[in-house]
Amino acid sequence: MTQIKIKRVYEDPKTVDGCRVLVDRLWPRGMKKERLKYDVWEKDISPSTELRKWFHEDPVEHWEGFSAMYRKELETSETARNFLTKIKPYKTVTLLYASKEPVRNHARILQQFLETHLGES
């Protein structure tokens, strides 16, 4: 089964990262395109713009609601289903995100979603 890791875009790449996937809708601040080592940018699997903006108004207060709404977006997303199919051949996939918050960020929710659905297949 595919192992799903998450990592900030500002951390150095490692060979154990496997396929490195940028999962932010917006390009990371201060990161030059030639500096970021990634294999694919899957911005359409990130939260919708409206959901992202709402979450950033108050990340602590909105975390639980954001988590539930983003999971719902993923469950109904053809992009998410296609992404699951795309990553199955890889031994390791590392989801790259820019947030300074290691726990309350969309990459962690996406990681859980992917692990759950990869385990079902």
Where are these regions (language model features)?
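Residues lining hydrophobic/aromatic ligand-binding pockets adjacent to catalytic sites
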Residues: 1-121
